[in-house]
Amino acid sequence: MVDDPYTLAVIDFSSQSQFTDEKRIIVGTPALTGGDLLEVWRTNEIPENGNFGEIQYRTTSTLVFGQLLMSSDSGDMESLTHAIYQQISQLQHELSYEKMIRVWNYLPWINRHDDGLERYQSFCVGRHQAIDTSLGYESHLPAATAIGTHDNHVLV
């Protein structure tokens, strides 16, 4: 199934987030039971690969499935998150996709304190600042999850 041309994405729950290609998203959250755990997303169209800034994505005529992986050493969590969500908004505009359906945010050391705030709180501030600059965005908010990891990358 992983090599099927109709596979939109493969989420690989491993020990460290990394980028291998547009189809495979490797998340730094290993399965508690050990062993490999893959989640496969398929579509009825053959997806096309693309990239925009630091976003790698796959698209069909009706959806975009993307990933953006950045080292958390690239800046403080608030600024990093703001930059990530600005890129996402720009890609949405570029591809004429108004709404996101679902967003998973994988944050390293989510409860660690940086500059007086938990990293999760700093993430929320940066995301809000990026979202708040997009006219009417509040009516298109997606379902979203923030998950803590033990590696050094932010993956959205």
What are the residue ranges of the model-derived segments?
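Short, polar/acidic, helix-capping and beta-turn segments at strand->helix junctions
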Residues: 1-156
